[in-house]
């Protein structure tokens, strides 16, 4: 299984879940508000908002929180956020992309830079690691929807590019611009997905041992603790033996 899928499994096992959950709700709400403010407040007419609402629901964000986030955008009292992407290297040369939404660019740049340097990494220029990733759409399904062949056929029909199937489930990739269309076609065939989102998919990975993984997790945890940070993507790879010890 590729590194980006393993990260979800680590987060699932980590003990910081309650605090992390409330922070996640707040980040997902912010994405909903920004998406609704930039386009139509109806998710059916606004693909970005539809994805934001879907991601919130798949993370068990309550409906009233979702509705409130949309209402905040339409009520005119939503803050203005800049979306800024930072790129750098973590411990052992792992590539790291940090996506932020901020109402104060100087504060965010300073915090992100300091977090990298305090945790064995260094912040680079935009584009310094981006070439090691591709922007893709990702749709995930549980293993219970069908075997690998069934899901592969549905994915081909839907216009997807690639499928990774394992005992943990199915991960379907498509061009970033096709995500809305592909996810609709998949849902017509396989039912509602577990998650549908845009991701940075590593094209090259860096293998880490246990110590390297522990250092990387420390950096990612520190970055994700910043309220301005929406998501962090890395290109680590680690063996199942290493993952089992985390």
Swiss-Prot record:
Annotated region described as Disordered, given as residue ranges: 1-21
The main location class comes to cytoplasm
Molecular function (GO) terms listed? Answer: DNA binding
Record-linked InterPro entries: Integrase-like_N, TACO1_YebC-like_2nd/3rd_dom, TACO1_YebC_N, Transcrip_reg_TACO1-like, Transcrip_reg_TACO1-like_dom3, YebC-like
From what superkingdom does this record's organism come?
Bacteria
Write out the GO biological process terms.
regulation of DNA-templated transcription
What name appears for this protein in its UniProt entry?
A: Probable transcriptional regulatory protein TM1040_1893
What residue ranges are annotated as transmembrane? Answer: none
Organism, scientific name? Ruegeria sp. (strain TM1040) (Silicibacter sp.)
Note the SS bond partners. none
Question: Which keywords accompany this UniProt record?
Answer: Cytoplasm, DNA-binding, Transcription, Transcription regulation
């Amino acid at each position: 299984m590729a590194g980006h899928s393993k990260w979800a499994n680590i987060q699932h096992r980590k003990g910081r879940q309650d605090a992390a959950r409330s922070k996640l709700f707040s980040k997902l709400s912010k994405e909903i508000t920004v998406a609704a403010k930039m386009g139509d407040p109806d998710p059916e007419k606004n693909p970005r908002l539809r994805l934001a609402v879907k991601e919130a629901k798949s993370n068990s964000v309550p409906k009233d929180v979702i509705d409130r986030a949309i209402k905040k955008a339409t009520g005119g009292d939503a803050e203005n956020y800049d979306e800024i992407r930072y790129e750098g290297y973590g411990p052992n040369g792992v590539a790291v992309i940090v996506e932020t939404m901020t109402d104060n660019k100087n504060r965010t740049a300073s915090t992100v830079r300091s977090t990298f340097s305090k945790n064995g990494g260094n912040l680079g220029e935009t584009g310094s690691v981006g070439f090691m990733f591709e922007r893709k759409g990702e749709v995930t399904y549980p293993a219970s929807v069908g075997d690998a062949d069934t899901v592969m056929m549905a994915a081909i029909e839907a216009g997807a590019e690639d499928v990774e199937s394992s005992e943990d489930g199915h991960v379907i990739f498509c061009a970033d611009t096709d995500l809305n269309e592909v996810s609709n076609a998949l849902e017509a065939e396989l039912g509602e997905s577990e998650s549908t989102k845009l991701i940075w998919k590593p094209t090259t990975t860096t293998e880490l041992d246990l110590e390297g993984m522990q250092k990387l997790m420390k950096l990612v945890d520190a970055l994700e603790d910043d309220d301005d940070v929406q998501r962090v993507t890395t290109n680590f790879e680690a063996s199942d033996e290493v993952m089992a010890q985390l």
